[in-house]
Amino acid sequence: MIMEIRKIGDPILKIKAKKVEKIDEKVKNLVRDMIETMKFSNGVGLAAPQVGESLRIIVVDYEENPIAFINPEILEMDGEVLDYEGCLSVPGVEVPIKRAERIIFKAQDLQGRTKRYKAKGLLARVIQHEVDHLEGILILDRAVEESTLAEEK
C-alpha cells in the first residue's frame, strides 16, 4: 500500500523514533509498504517517521534491490564529502550537506539478526540521511553554507 509521505512541519519528523522491540507481521507489513512507497515516489531511501510511524526502520534502494534496516546504528564514519541532497519530506529543495564518505553500521534484518555493514559513496550518504530522520533531523538542519567566502558590500 502506498503511504502518505509526511512533509516538513509535521511534528513526527522532529522527534526521535522508538526502537523496534519485536519484528512481527506488523513491522514486516510496514516495511513492505515503505518499499512500495519509496519506489512509487522515486526515492532512494525512506524512514518510518516519513510515513507517520515513529519507529527506527529505514529502507534503501541498493542497486535496484530494496533493503530494510531495523534499529540502524552508525558505528564508524570516515572521510567527508560535500554534496547536494533532496528529501521526499522537503519537496523541491536541494541543499549542500557534508557527510562521511564511508561508514560502518549495524542493524537488524527482518529475521531479527543483528549484522554489521560497510557502506561508501551514495549508499553511505543515503543511510546517514535516513538515520537522521530517526533522530528527528531534516536536511535543512544539516545544510552548510554554499560558500564560506562572502563578498562584503
UniProtKB/Swiss-Prot annotation:
Q: What EC number(s) are associated with this protein in UniProt?
A: 3.5.1.88
Residues annotated to bind Fe cation:
C87, H129, H133
What are its GO biological-process terms? Answer: co-translational protein modification; translation
Identify one Pfam family in the record.
Pep_deformylase
Q: What is the catalytic activity of this protein?
A: N-terminal N-formyl-L-methionyl-[peptide] + H2O = N-terminal L-methionyl-[peptide] + formate
Q: How is the cofactor bound?
A: Binds 1 Fe(2+) ion.
Q: What InterPro entries does its record include?
A: Peptide_deformylase (IPR023635), Peptide_deformylase_sf (IPR036821)
Indicate the secretion signal residues. Answer: none
What CDD domains does UniProt report for this protein, alphabetically? Pep_deformylase
Q: Say which domain of life the source belongs to.
A: Bacteria
The active site consists of: E130
Task: Name the Gene Ontology molecular function terms of this record.
Answer: metal ion binding; peptide deformylase activity
The entry's keywords = Hydrolase, Iron, Metal-binding, Protein biosynthesis
The keyword Hydrolase appears for this protein: yes
Needed cofactors, names only, are: Fe(2+)
Give the similarity note.
Belongs to the polypeptide deformylase family.
Question: What PANTHER family does the record point to?
Answer: PEPTIDE DEFORMYLASE
Supply the NCBIfam families for this chain. Answer: pept_deformyl, PRK00150.1-3
Q: What does this protein do?
A: Removes the formyl group from the N-terminal Met of newly synthesized proteins. Requires at least a dipeptide for an efficient rate of reaction. N-terminal L-methionine is a prerequisite for activity but the enzyme has broad specificity at other positions.
Could you tell me what this protein is called?
A: Peptide deformylase
- Species of provenance: Dictyoglomus turgidum (strain DSM 6724 / Z-1310)
